[in-house]
């Protein structure tokens, strides 16, 4: 790259990519229903002692603020304020060993996550037993 403008542009893009990745998964994420393609909620992921958890902080218009598939102590519990993602730990740039709760079914699944799209997307996979027996949702970072 002999052109100084090209060099500066390349350096700036490298810095932006590094900053996006440095944020990790902490922050707010808009969930998108993988069946309808519509946004459903905003989840805030926080970190405490290397463990990442996610709590619903906002629902999109038209989404009921009650847990439809919940039973026991979560029956008809409000979704806003509910922790649905627990126990993720960073390992080699990926987030593993967690659990994700599906309010629609009332089931809890094993979970893992990975940043995509320069840190603007989070691929969250919920599964039973082995990862091949699950499904992935792509959440979008809320800025």
Residue ranges and their predicted role:
Residues 1-11:
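Bacterial N-terminal signal peptides that target proteins for export
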Residues 16-20:
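N-terminal signal peptide c-region/cleavage motif recognized by signal peptidases
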Residues 70-76, 123-130:
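Short aromatic-glycine motifs in intrinsically disordered, low-complexity regions
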Residues 121, 127-143:
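Edge beta-strand at a domain terminus
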